[in-house]
């Protein structure tokens, strides 16, 4: 069932895509982002265009709002967010959390093999998606730089082709 009032935590591409989708389906959506703008990895102009479009479509976009806690008060669900040093209370019926992902690199023996991780906790690879060991490849969320399904599928093709046929195709992010 479509929630009447939806809070979306996160202003990245996935949070923004789902914000607009639910709003267009008829939910009253409030998007909460702790950074100064949504779509922070994009050019500021792109961010502004998306935010303005969302507001034209009736979406409440709250930037510089840091989610602190969820409460139930008198049967009502409330998100408490901090903005400019003050608490802001946002009532909602459902919440969608889209605040990013971290690659899961623990428990696979990468540390024991000495396979280095980048600062983003992704496996370091070369342009052929090989690690420091030419027979170990990484792709998808664990290889970065983007954590999208379509990127993972694209990288998987490159890694498989390179593993089977040698250094055949370079992946360019």
Q: Where do the model's predicted regions map?
A:
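FAD-site-proximal beta/loop scaffold in flavoenzymes
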Residues: 1-4, 89-167
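Rossmann-like dinucleotide-binding cores of NAD(P)H-dependent redox enzymes
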Residues: 3-7, 13-87, 145-153, 161, ...
